Swiss-Prot record:
HAMAP family: UPF0301. It comes from the Bacteria. This is UPF0301 protein Aave_0907. Belongs to the UPF0301 (AlgH) family.
Length: 213
C-alpha cells in the first residue's frame, strides 16, 4: 500500500462468506462489521440463529419481555468469541451518559467511532446503528421502551491486525456496504442471498476462486 493511501475501512459493511470458507462458524455467513481499523475488525454474524429466542434470553436474565413483536425473534450466534456474552445491535438512540463497549482480542469495541449513547456500554457505528453490551438496553426493552429494531447475539467475530485483509486477499469474503433492511426486515433464511443481491450476484454464480474486496 502506498504510504499516502488511506487504510481500508469496512465499518458498516457486510462480509459475505465465499463457498471456499469452510470454517463452521462462518460458512455461508453474513457478518455486519461494527468496527474496522488498522488494529483489526469486530463484527456480528446476522444470519445464524441459535435455538434460544429473545423471550428465552430474557427469562434467563430474570426480565419480562413486553414487546410481543420481539418475543419469538431468535438470538443469533454472533461469532466464536465470548459466546456467553450478549451483544445488541440496534438503531441509534441518541446521546446520554454512555460509555464505550469493550471487546477482547483483535479489534476493540471502543475508541474511534464510540460516542455517548443512551446506554452504559455502547459503541456508535457510522450508518445509524449502535452495538450495546450492557444490560440496561434489555431492561429498556423489557418495559416496552428501548430501540424499535434490534438484533441480539451471543458472541462476536473478531480479526486481529491485518487478519481480515489477509482473508480478503485469499478470496474468503465478498464485501458490500450494509443495508439495514437485510439486518432487520429480511427473513433469516434469505439474508445471505439478499446480501449477495446487493452486489448483483446470486449464490450459483460463486466459486471458491472468485472474490471481491
Amino acid at each position: 500500500m502506498p504510504a499516502d493511501s488511506a487504510p481500508m475501512n469496512l465499518t458498516h459493511h457486510f462480509l459475505i462468506a465465499m463457498p471456499g470458507l469452510e470454517d463452521e462458524s462462518f460458512a455461508r455467513s453474513v457478518v455486519y462489521l461494527c468496527e474496522h481499523s488498522e488494529r483489526g475488525a469486530l463484527g456480528l454474524i446476522i444470519n445464524k440463529p441459535s435455538d434460544l429466542s429473545l423471550k428465552g434470553l430474557f427469562d434467563k436474565v430474570d426480565l419480562s419481555l413486553r414487546r410481543e413483536d420481539l418475543s419469538l425473534e431468535p438470538v443469533f450466534r454472533g461469532g466464536p468469541v465470548q459466546t456467553e456474552r450478549g451483544f445488541v445491535l440496534h438503531e441509534a438512540m441518541g446521546p446520554s451518559s454512555g460509555k464505550q463497549a469493550a471487546g477482547e482480542g483483535g479489534a476493540q469495541a471502543e475508541g474511534e467511532g464510540a460516542e455517548e449513547s443512551a446506554y452504559a456500554s455502547t459503541m456508535s457505528i457510522p450508518g445509524g446503528l449502535e452495538m450495546t453490551t450492557s444490560k440496561d438496553v434489555l431492561e429498556a426493552l423489557s418495559t416496552g421502551a428501548g430501540p424499535r429494531r434490534v438484533l441480539v447475539t451471543l458472541g462476536y467475530s473478531s480479526w486481529g491486525e491485518g487478519q481480515l485483509e489477509s482473508e480478503l486477499a485469499e478470496n474468503s469474503w465478498l464485501t458490500v456496504g450494509a443495508d439495514l433492511s437485510v439486518i432487520f426486515d429480511t427473513p433469516v433464511g434469505q439474508r445471505y442471498d439478499r446480501a449477495l443481491a446487493l452486489l448483483g450476484l446470486q449464490s450459483w454464480m460463486l466459486s471458491p476462486e472468485a472474490g471481491h474486496a
